[in-house]
């Protein structure tokens, strides 16, 4: 490709409304342009990267035995009503009516459509197992689209769905997809980590997320220092204390605490050890019989709402109770709540169950109890894992301790079981002629999100540093004063021809531009290898070669450059 015949729309200035580096650089490098909130057009450079990501995803899906199909982005609402998600999904589901007043949605995902397709096309166990995938545009009406392609409303996704009669083949396909996702991210040259995850609104029995590691990642990953164990912070299991509860050494006493509305203020004012305090959080209960539930964690710990959501007593999704309701039921407001004398169900974290001589609110405004001990001062409550893990704690596999990293979720695989097939009556006849509900798996990759995540992991102060496999161009040719020197023109054109014939994506900057502008553009758009051609180089019989990632410059003899570039590009 010649720059003179290409839409290279680079910008010097960082757009004011771009918050994260990938959004900034995708705009500056001329990869995307905003059309409306969360909606973007891909310019040629951006589309080249997107298509390379898409190609790797497609190749690995095909290798894993998945079969490509294509389903409509517009879906009939009737299917969503069947599964109950018409009501459950929320405002992210964009709903509309056609001219005949029929309800439709813009698909954020395709479980309903694929299940409907399979129940019509597959009738016998002989047609199973089956794994179908598509690469299709999705739409989620995010309340606040942000971070460019990291959280846009419209995005490109690969979603696969597998169908089975038995758990064994479902497990085999799940493992194949796990390996395929690992291969995809490895081929793209990205540092990543698969982690155990909560199944969320999609549901199911097993789930893994695939995270590209980056400091800007929205997700916190807890991983073992001694093994491959890793989990999303929402899923990471807190250790159950092995030490017995300490004996009581303090008397229970009621203390005036007028200026201690938070744990931090209580600890500072009374010189307490924060691990000797608890936080009492009141959430909405799951039934009229239990309208409120108290969840108690240690003062230095944070409530894990995903874990709390799984408690039978707690309404789903977890909702903090309004202060007015708390005051009406308990007689005190947040900041003065505790377990003694509570007339609502209590669930305490494992770490709280072994505490002794601890402090908590007295359920009277501006008062706390100090020296609380279980069994002596109040009965032991229901115990559960309801908190986030913290760095340094032992991991559940016993092989190390927790460490933390930030990640950007780019892939998610689920074992759905019969969540959708049962509600939609997707059945087949087994070998005995009996009707069986299909087991399902679901496997998603954010194709457009990978592009942004790759940038978040690969950039410097000059621009993007693309991994080799997904760079828009592998080689950039920079001829100095090309329009004044026939020698430079001839050699640049020959190299351009040779690289094209070798199947290498090359960009020849044939503009009448200052060298500084040409260099800046090549670095901004992240081309891995650049070759500078000038009269001085020609006199010396060498090309000046620069590696974008390392910054290393070398003078390469004419007869060696092509082999060097072939080896560098092909890896």
UniProtKB/Swiss-Prot annotation:
**Keywords in alphabetical order:** Aminoacyl-tRNA synthetase, ATP-binding, Cytoplasm, Ligase, Nucleotide-binding, Protein biosynthesis
Tell me the enzyme class.
ligase
Catalyses which reaction? tRNA(Pro) + L-proline + ATP = L-prolyl-tRNA(Pro) + AMP + diphosphate
InterPro entries for this protein: aa-tRNA-synt_IIb (IPR002314), aa-tRNA-synth_II (IPR006195), aa-tRNA-synth_II/BPL/LPL (IPR045864), Anticodon-bd (IPR004154), Anticodon-bd_dom_sf (IPR036621), Pro-tRNA-ligase_IIa (IPR002316), Pro-tRNA-synth_IIa_bac-type (IPR004500), Pro-tRNA-Synthase_IIa_type1 (IPR023717)
Identify the Gene3D superfamilies for this entry. Answer: Anticodon-binding domain, Bira Bifunctional Protein, Domain 2, YbaK/aminoacyl-tRNA synthetase-associated domain
Its GO CC terms are: cytosol
The EC number on file is 6.1.1.15
Enumerate the Gene Ontology biological process terms.
Answer: prolyl-tRNA aminoacylation
Molecular-function GO terms, alphabetical: aminoacyl-tRNA deacylase activity; ATP binding; proline-tRNA ligase activity
Chief site of localization: cytoplasm
**Where does it live in the cell?**
Cytoplasm
Q: Which proteins does it associate with, and in what oligomeric form?
A: Homodimer.
Q: Which family does it belong to?
A: Belongs to the class-II aminoacyl-tRNA synthetase family. ProS type 1 subfamily.
Q: What does this protein do?
A: Catalyzes the attachment of proline to tRNA(Pro) in a two-step reaction: proline is first activated by ATP to form Pro-AMP and then transferred to the acceptor end of tRNA(Pro). As ProRS can inadvertently accommodate and process non-cognate amino acids such as alanine and cysteine, to avoid such errors it has two additional distinct editing activities against alanine. One activity is designated as 'pretransfer' editing and involves the tRNA(Pro)-independent hydrolysis of activated Ala-AMP.
Task: Tell me the domain comment.
Answer: Consists of three domains: the N-terminal catalytic domain, the editing domain and the C-terminal anticodon-binding domain.
The name this protein carries in UniProt is Proline--tRNA ligase
């Amino acid at each position: 490709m010649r720059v003179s015949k290409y839409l290279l729309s680079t910008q010097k200035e960082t757009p004011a409304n771009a918050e994260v580096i990938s959004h900034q650089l995708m705009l500056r490098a001329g990869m995307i342009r905003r059309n409306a909130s969360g909606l973007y057009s891909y310019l040629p450079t951006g589309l080249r990267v997107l298509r390379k990501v898409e190609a790797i995803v497609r190749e690995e899906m095909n290798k894993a035995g998945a079969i490509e199909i294509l389903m409509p982005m517009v879906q009939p609402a009737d299917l969503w009503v069947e599964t109950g998600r018409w009501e459950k999904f929320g405002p992210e589901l964009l709903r509309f009516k056609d001219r005949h007043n029929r309800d439709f949605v813009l698909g954020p995902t395709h479980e309903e459509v694929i299940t409907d397709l399979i129940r019509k096309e597959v009738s016998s166990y002989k047609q199973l197992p089956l794994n179908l995938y598509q690469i299709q545009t999705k739409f989620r009406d995010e309340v606040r689209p942000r971070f460019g392609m990291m959280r846009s409303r419209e995005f490109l996704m690969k979603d696969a769905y597998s169908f089975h009669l038995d758990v064994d083949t479902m497990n085999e396909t799940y493992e194949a997809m796990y390996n395929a996702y690992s291969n995809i991210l490895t081929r793209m040259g990205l540092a990543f980590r698969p982690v155990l995850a909560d199944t969320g609104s999609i549901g199911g029995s097993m789930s893994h997320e695939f995270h590209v590691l980056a400091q800007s990642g929205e997700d916190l990953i807890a991983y073992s220092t001694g093994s491959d164990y890793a989990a999303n912070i929402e899923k990471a299991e807190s250790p159950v204390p092995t030490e017995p509860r300490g004996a009581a050494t303090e008397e229970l006493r009621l203390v005036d605490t007028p200026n201690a509305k938070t744990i931090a203020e209580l600890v500072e004012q009374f010189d307490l050890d924060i691990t000797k305090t608890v936080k009492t959080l009141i959430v909405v209960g799951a039934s009229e019989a239990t309208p409120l539930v108290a969840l108690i964690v240690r003062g230095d710990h944070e409530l894990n709402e995903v874990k709390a959501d799984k408690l039978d007593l707690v309404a789903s999704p977890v909702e903090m109770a309004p202060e007015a309701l708390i005051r009406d039921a308990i007689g005190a407001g947040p900041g003065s709540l505790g377990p003694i004398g509570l007339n609502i169900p209590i669930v305490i974290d494992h770490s709280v169950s072994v505490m002794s001589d601890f402090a908590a609110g007295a359920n009277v405004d501006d008062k706390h109890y100090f020296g609380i001990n279980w069994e002596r001062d109040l009965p032991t409550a229901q115990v559960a894992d309801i908190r986030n893990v913290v760095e340094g704690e032992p991991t559940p596999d016993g092989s190390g301790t927790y460490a933390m990293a930030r990640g950007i979720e780019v892939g998610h695989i689920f074992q759905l079981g019969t969540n959708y097939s049962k509600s939609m009556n997707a059945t087949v006849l087994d070998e005995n002629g009996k009707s069986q509900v299909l087991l399902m798996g679901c496997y998603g990759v954010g194709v457009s999100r990978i592009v942004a995540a790759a940038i978040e992991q690969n950039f410097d102060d000059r621009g993007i540093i693309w991994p080799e496999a997904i760079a828009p161009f592998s080689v950039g040719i920079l001829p100095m004063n090309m329009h004044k020197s026939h020698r430079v023109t001839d050699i640049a054109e020959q190299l351009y021809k040779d690289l094209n014939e070798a199947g290498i994506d090359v960009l020849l900057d044939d503009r009448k531009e200052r060298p500084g502008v040409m260099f800046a553009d090549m670095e901004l758009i992240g081309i891995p290898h650049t070759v500078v051609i000038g009269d001085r180089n020609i006199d010396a019989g060498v090309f000046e070669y620069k590696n974008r990632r390392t910054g290393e410059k070398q003078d390469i003899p004419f007869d060696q450059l092509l082999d060097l570039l072939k080896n560098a590009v092909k890896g």
